[in-house]
Swiss-Prot record:
<feature type="binding site">
    <location>
        <position position="168"/>
    </location>
    <ligand>
        <name>FMN</name>
    </ligand>
</feature>
<feature type="binding site">
    <location>
        <begin position="60"/>
        <end position="64"/>
    </location>
    <ligand>
        <name>FMN</name>
    </ligand>
</feature>
<feature type="binding site">
    <location>
        <position position="84"/>
    </location>
    <ligand>
        <name>FMN</name>
    </ligand>
</feature>
<protein>
    <recommendedName>
        <fullName>Dihydroorotate dehydrogenase (quinone)</fullName>
        <ecNumber>1.3.5.2</ecNumber>
    </recommendedName>
</protein>
<dbReference type="InterPro" id="IPR050074">
    <property type="entry name" value="DHO_dehydrogenase"/>
</dbReference>
<dbReference type="GO" id="GO:0044205">
    <property type="term" value="P:'de novo' UMP biosynthetic process"/>
</dbReference>
<dbReference type="InterPro" id="IPR013785">
    <property type="entry name" value="Aldolase_TIM"/>
</dbReference>
<feature type="binding site">
    <location>
        <position position="168"/>
    </location>
    <ligand>
        <name>substrate</name>
    </ligand>
</feature>
<feature type="binding site">
    <location>
        <position position="64"/>
    </location>
    <ligand>
        <name>substrate</name>
    </ligand>
</feature>
<comment type="subunit">
    <text>Monomer.</text>
</comment>
<dbReference type="InterPro" id="IPR005720">
    <property type="entry name" value="Dihydroorotate_DH_cat"/>
</dbReference>
<feature type="binding site">
    <location>
        <position position="264"/>
    </location>
    <ligand>
        <name>FMN</name>
    </ligand>
</feature>
<keyword id="KW-0560">Oxidoreductase</keyword>
<feature type="binding site">
    <location>
        <position position="241"/>
    </location>
    <ligand>
        <name>FMN</name>
    </ligand>
</feature>
<dbReference type="InterPro" id="IPR001295">
    <property type="entry name" value="Dihydroorotate_DH_CS"/>
</dbReference>
<comment type="pathway">
    <text>Pyrimidine metabolism; UMP biosynthesis via de novo pathway; orotate from (S)-dihydroorotate (quinone route): step 1/1.</text>
</comment>
<dbReference type="GO" id="GO:0106430">
    <property type="term" value="F:dihydroorotate dehydrogenase (quinone) activity"/>
</dbReference>
């Protein structure tokens, strides 16, 4: 057991979850984390035209405001995703809005896209030396009169500093946002964002990959609709998945009925089923980032086997500590050695059929 698991977690878990998160950001800002990322060509992957030093990324939600981008890479991540960022700064939903379900090793959040807004986050990213891969997760303000316009504004604002974009239309904490996943709305959203990318490509001289982040709470027909629209688009990939509104199978917890999206261990199965189904529906070429319930090398590799090219996590780090990316890296390399595998990509799609056969119970 690590120092964090023995001492650090107990101390942090005595604090309000949001306060503990803010302390983690301050710790990373301090520069006290001196880890070096393990560099091994077997972990390197090329996805959507980008070369990732390793396949593990920090999911959006941790570094919302791009305050600790470079420090995150010292934790062992191959890429990071900042945000969700909206055009105007917003405070988010009323507190308390973040809850630990310790019995389930899960988190419920209803943060509501609290962030510093486009301009401040852009300026922070512009002030760093661009080397490691940083994605920007874009969203819409709660009070906006033009949701799609907010996403277009995000593409334009961050085009010169982002390595890729994630279009977040799947947060359950902004009323009506998930309606953008409906087929007609999605078609219009994709059209407008693609046009924005085309215009910015002409202006800047290069193209930025765009990913769409999905909810895990869609029906089979809704997944078919998303797949159909993506197949007709020039989007580069999917992020599967966001948090879930479902609470089935949770242990007794004082917070299990709190409103908001559930992440952590209980999300692994559902998010992996959706991942595999989307891989089946979209074929082998489109890029997919697998998120949800990644806790160790086994769950990280299972995402790859279910069809992911890259993997992200955040909640796992809350429970397992800041060494999680480094530990997963070491364990994955050991497993690759045992399996006689030379590249992480060799595992992709091995278990797609296994996961895709499960029904999505709503």
């Amino acid at each position: 057991m690590s120092f964090f698991q023995c001492i650090g977690r107990s101390a942090l878990f005595m604090l309000d979850p949001e306060h503990a998160h803010n302390l983690a950001i301050l710790w990373l800002k301090s520069g006290l984390n001196s880890h070096k990322r393990i560099v091994d060509k077997r972990l390197s992957v090329r996805v959507a035209g980008l070369k990732f030093e390793n396949f593990m990324g920090l999911a959006a939600g941790f570094d919302k405001n791009a305050e600790v981008v470079d420090a995150v890479f010292r934790l062992g991540f191959g890429f990071t995703e900042v945000g969700t960022v909206t055009p105007k700064p917003q405070a988010g939903n009323a507190k308390p809005r973040l809850f630990r379900l310790k019995e389930d090793e899960a988190i419920i959040n209803r943060m509501g896209f609290n962030n510093d807004g486009h301009q401040i986050v852009h300026d922070r990213l512009q002030g760093r030396k661009k080397s490691d891969i940083v994605g920007v997760n874009i969203g819409a303000n709660k009070d906006t009169l033009n949701r799609i316009g907010d996403y277009v504004a995000g593409i334009t604002c961050f085009y010169d500093v982002a390595d890729y974009f994630t279009v977040n239309i799947s947060s359950p904490n902004t009323p009506g946002l998930r309606d953008l996943q409906a087929r007609d709305n999605l078609r219009l959203l994709i059209k407008e964002i693609s046009q924005a990318r085309s215009e910015n490509k002409k202006k800047h001289g290069f193209s930025i990959p765009i990913f769409l982040k999905l909810a895990p709470d869609l029906t089979e027909q809704e997944l078919d609709d998303v797949a159909a629209e993506l197949s007709l688009s020039d989007f580069d990939g999917l992020v599967v998945s966001n948090t879930t509104l479902f609470r089935q199978g949770l242990k007794k917890s004082a917070f299990m009925n709190e409103g908001g999206g559930l992440s952590g261990r209980p999300l692994f199965e559902r998010s992996t089923i959706v991942l595999a189904k989307m891989r089946q529906k979209l074929g082998k070429d489109i890029a997919i980032i697998g998120v949800g319930g990644v806790w160790d090398a086994q769950t990280a590799l299972e995402k790859i086997k279910a069809g992911a090219d890259l993997v992200q996590f955040y909640s796992g780090m809350v429970y397992e500590g800041p060494d999680l990316a480094k530990n997963i890296t070491k364990d994955v390399l050991q497993m690759m050695q045992q399996d006689g595998v030379d590249t992480i990509k060799a595992y992709r799609d091995h278990h797609v059929e296994k996961w895709a056969k499960f029904e999505l119970h709503l």
